[in-house]
Amino acid sequence: MNFVFLWAALGGAIGSSLRYFVGKVMPSKFLMFESFPLGTFSVNLIGCFVIGFMGHLAAKKVFGDDFGIFFVTGVLGGFTTFSSYGLDTLKLLQKSQYLEAVSYVLGTNLLGLIGVAIGWFLAKNFVGVN
């Protein structure tokens, strides 16, 4: 029997639970902002870093397909929250919190890309998988 869907579902349950936890422990006041979706912001940046790291290892066949499905598709798919990111941005805009909304969008995208690049670089150069 093929367990690919089970691996993805199990990983998704773990990732979603971790996302919920991070969202609950993060404050809503951040830097100069009274209301900022720091939990969603954090999980997206962490997820970008980890997917960069794991993406390099997957490309070099360091682990099998089942683990890749479990971790990348399941755990990271459940952990990162692009749909929540869109909703959080819309809510900021609806409350006329334009500076927060723009900072959130630019910060998530720029820092997310940097996180992916750093994760890839570390996996490539320090794990010894070229």
UniProtKB/Swiss-Prot annotation:
InterPro entries: FluC. The chain crosses the membrane at residues 3-23, 38-58, 67-87, 102-122. It catalyses: fluoride(in) = fluoride(out). One of its GO terms (molecular function) is metal ion binding. Pfam families: CRCB. Na(+) binds at residues 77, 80. Keywords: Cell inner membrane, Cell membrane, Ion channel, Ion transport, Membrane, Metal-binding, Sodium, Transmembrane, Transmembrane helix, Transport. Na(+) is not transported, but it plays an essential structural role and its presence is essential for fluoride channel function. One of its GO terms (biological process) is cellular detoxification of fluoride. The keyword Hydrolase does not apply. GO terms for cellular component: plasma membrane. NCBIfam families: crcB. It is found in: Cell inner membrane. It comes from the Bacteria. This is Fluoride-specific ion channel FluC. Fluoride-specific ion channel. Important for reducing fluoride concentration in the cell, thus reducing its toxicity. It comes from Helicobacter pylori (strain HPAG1). It is a multi-pass membrane protein. Belongs to the fluoride channel Fluc/FEX (TC 1.A.43) family. HAMAP family: FluC.
